[in-house]
């Protein structure tokens, strides 16, 4: 506790953080405030309460008593992904129970509706689902908790989650251009995140120079999301209709261009697919999957040099991209660059022990 300050930070950690460790530890400890760090090491999304404290109601009482003891006047709740959801859930409830305190929330990619298709809460939670707290849209809206939701515009679920709350007055949406889901990590490599959070504390604004216009358009998020789901259901024709409409709304969105390219490829429209993948790369040079599909299509067309370049660019963007490493290894084997082929296959085996395709390449070359 910092008894000289009436400001309190409550930081909720994201997934896969071991017991005793906390996210934002260094940044929040630089703040002139009292600090509370919370972690759910079993990826429970905080819907069963704070581990070691009890269910959500008991956890709220626990935080209520601490804030009273600290004589808090201002509270900032902060968290990425699972932690962003926790910050919004507990912030909304605490604000209604403690109206004399100013509560604010800074969420980095938190979900507003858990367990829907493509939601990380459905894929990564290691605890039973709790439908009672699955959809917090009405809760955060009625609580009037001031929320800033910062999210990457290179993530379909994050874009759709923002779509779900677009227009709610107390939620300020900020999309970050070409950022993946781990938007706080992405921003931490590009800006002074401590300074940005301190400015938010002082002025109530979280300013990002790399903000995109994706957060401004509600319909785009639904079109992209449902176009993606239709592709998963092998309904490429309907997916293309939605994705083409999404592109008319935001033509310069790399992820939408990439997804349209994939849908076109499903219908074997290779030339059109390649065009949209190249548009995606022009908009986001680090979009690994777009590089992979350009490489794959180029190899199909016999352009080995272009294929090699884009496989390597894919791996530069995502060094653990197994499909790109395997494809590049096969390409090198085809052109008799055996040492390079082995190098790629050994990298695959380092990331994916026992990978059959990599083992087969190694056996063929070293027999």
What feature does the model see in each segment?
Residues 118-188, 192-195, 200-204:
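The feature captures the conserved acid-bearing segment of alpha/beta-hydrolase catalytic domains
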